[in-house]
């Protein structure tokens, strides 16, 4: 399938190694595409969990996906600053239905103050055993963890300060419903979070 264009909405589907659908984001606006990269924004997006529970995201989030990297990144714009959630996951594929990837359980969360935390190591150990992750996948994910920490420390790619500002501004240029902005009436808060 050809890459979506800026302003298009796509669904994002996260699967587990055994092929089960883990989570679905219904409407993500694409703000940038390159040969191997899709950057999008979720803003009050309907999310459906594997057990059927549905909820709406509370704050805008910029998502970064790469066809060759074994992680994806969510930058969440929160009142106290930008927090990052990096999923160790397969590179994405794209078909008519959605952007899809396999979630490999491990996550690195970066708080607005810069603190980093590895999450779900116990879930990874359990699923590795249950679903027989290969040694190759285990090795890729271990090396990717170090690569990801390096990106975070060097403020590379989606962790660069300007990344959030640039792509959130682009989102606001593309969206037809600007009066629904998360920051409507709170522009000073927006400037503080984005560092503008």
From Swiss-Prot:
Its cofactor is Mg(2+). It catalyses: a ribonucleoside 5'-triphosphate + H2O = a ribonucleoside 5'-diphosphate + phosphate + H(+); a ribonucleoside 5'-diphosphate + H2O = a ribonucleoside 5'-phosphate + phosphate + H(+). InterPro entries: DUF402, FomD-like_sf, Ntdp-like, SA1684. Its EC number is 3.6.1.15, 3.6.1.6. The active site is at 23 (proton donor). Keywords: Hydrolase, Magnesium, Metal-binding. Mg(2+) 1 binds at residues 87, 103, 107. It comes from the Bacteria. Mg(2+) 2 binds at residues 105, 107, 120, 123. Disulfide bonds: none annotated. One of its GO terms (molecular function) is nucleoside diphosphate phosphatase activity. Has nucleoside phosphatase activity towards nucleoside triphosphates and nucleoside diphosphates. Belongs to the Ntdp family. PANTHER family: PTHR39159, UPF0374 PROTEIN YGAC (PTHR39159:SF1). HAMAP family: Ntdp. This is Nucleoside triphosphate/diphosphate phosphatase. It comes from Lactobacillus johnsonii (strain CNCM I-12250 / La1 / NCC 533).
């Amino acid at each position: 399938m050809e890459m979506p264009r800026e302003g298009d909405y796509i669904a994002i589907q996260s699967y587990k190694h055994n092929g089960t659908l883990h989570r679905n984001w219904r409407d993500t606006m694409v703000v940038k595409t390159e040969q191997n990269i899709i950057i999008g924004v979720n803003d009050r997006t309907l999310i459906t969990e594997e057990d059927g529970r549905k909820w709406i995201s509370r704050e805008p989030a910029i998502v970064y996906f790469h066809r060759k990297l074994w992680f994806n990144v969510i930058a969440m714009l929160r009142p106290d600053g930008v927090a990052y959630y990096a999923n160790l996951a397969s590179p994405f594929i794209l078909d008519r239905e959605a952007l899809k990837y396999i979630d490999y359980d491990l996550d690195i969360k970066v708080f607005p103050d810069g603190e980093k935390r590895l999450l779900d190591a116990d879930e990874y150990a359990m699923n590795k055993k249950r679903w027989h992750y290969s040694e190759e996948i285990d090795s890729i994910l271990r090396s990717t963890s170090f690569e990801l920490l390096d990106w975070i420390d060097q403020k590379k790619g989606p962790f660069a300060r300007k990344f959030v500002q640039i792509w959130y501004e682009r989102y606001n240029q593309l969206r037809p419903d600007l009066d629904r902005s998360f920051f409507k009436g709170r522009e000073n808060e927006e400037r503080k979070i984005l560092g503008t």
